[in-house]
Curated annotation (Swiss-Prot):
Compartment(s) where it occurs, according to its Swiss-Prot or TrEMBL record: Cellular thylakoid membrane
Organism of provenance: Synechococcus sp. (strain WH7803)
Gene: psaM
Topological category with respect to the lipid bilayer: Single-pass membrane protein
InterPro entries membership: PSI_PsaM, PSI_PsaM_sf
Protein name per Swiss-Prot or TrEMBL: Photosystem I reaction center subunit XII
Transmembrane segments: 10-32
Keyword Membrane: yes
Length: 34
C-alpha cells in the first residue's frame, strides 16, 4: 500500500507540532508572569 504521506512523515509532523506547542505555552507563561 503506497500513500502520499508516510508514517515517518506523520511522526515528524507530530513532533514538530508538539515542540511548537510547548514553546508557545512557555512563551505565554513567561509573558503572564512578567
Amino acid at each position: 500500500m503506497v500513500s502520499s504521506i508516510t508514517q515517518a512523515e506523520i511522526f515528524i509532523a507530530l513532533v514538530v507540532a508538539a515542540h511548537a506547542g510547548v514553546l508557545a505555552v512557555r512563551l505565554c507563561v513567561s509573558l503572564y508572569r512578567a
